[in-house]
Amino acid sequence: MEHELGRRTFLKGAGAFAAAGASAGVINLAGQQNALADHHASAIGGGTYDFDSVYDRVGTNSVKWDRQITKYGSDDFKIGMGIADMDFKAPACIGEALEARTKHENWGYLDSTESLKEAICNWNKERYGIDVAQETVTIASGVHPGLIAALLAISPPASKVIMNTPTYNGFWTDLKWSRTVANENKLIKDKNGVYHIDWDDFEARLTPDTHAFLLCNPQNPTGNCWSEDDLLRMGELCLKHGVTVLADEIHCDFVNKGQTYTPFASLPDKAIVDNSVTFKAVSKTFSLAGMKNAYFYSTNPVLLERVRYYHRADLNTLGIVANEAAYREGAPWLDALLPYIDANHDFAEQYLKSQCPDIRYKKAQGTYLAWLKMEDLVTGIDAKAKAEQAGLKSPEHYMEQWLVERAHVQLNPGS
């Protein structure tokens, strides 16, 4: 990759590439900027919002950018694609709401989050047709604190938690804090690169020492938007074996063209829904991760109170303001963004297929993540042996370093 390549040249602004395996070839994207711009123009047809202008986040204490410069140096590191946040400016309504609040110049204790809860309920109703009762919503400082509280409430120490793997690596931290153990139901990949549940294995793992199923919907990193039939089958099996479903749906606002997000709480079987807690946020949707705000809810009051007992949220005034502004006024911005992200996925799939055939990518159904399959290329540079020599965790971690040094792009190792 050329050193002078702008970081928006390839997949402008869209989240993280996760490298499953590793690349033995440098992806030469020089000269692709116009092609991507044309692709977006043809796919979207213009609009009110500018998602093309380069927005420099360096110097903002960003994990995605500044941490990588500290780690690798600015000569090697040029493009950050290893953290799941976007590089677009947030919609103006958020900045305007924050500016208005800062004029009060006092940061005393918060009184109520009811207005935010109302906005959350309206968002779910308007976008997904879900009737979420306001009294069932609990505001959290992130999805992780909510999940940890739920695991503490329902899972004794050393008990097992089912997860469909590959999955979001942050879940292992939640298990650590709740002193629980991963029970991995490995997804099956078909010849077309699409992942499916191994149902026999899933049910076999619903053992008496398993108390929770940590569902990711849409799934990180594969991008699966689980169908209603899949969700019902998962829920039915969990209910049968006394396992509670914890549905992390943080990526639900990103669904690609022709796909459908089905909220677990919208399933037609009340008993299945009552056996679940849903966790959501718009931190991905509007790049608000630093504002530390999320929520969870359940239709089961007994289960909800058990989780609330273990949950504590020290909320941030500006986080409340920013999130409420996003829920109430951010929809037009998001509606304009979604086809842009969809076009990014299309471009990535087409470009990699034609220019980098050893890197396999199947367009995700949802999320703004790209799950790249590169394991065939690990052998090309003997990454396994070199990782061992360097004392690195895996060949993928060696390849993360290798890609930064040669392609100047930082990806999530995916292992």
Predicted regions located by residue number:
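Active-site phosphate-binding strand-loop segment of PLP-dependent enzymes
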Residues: 189-259
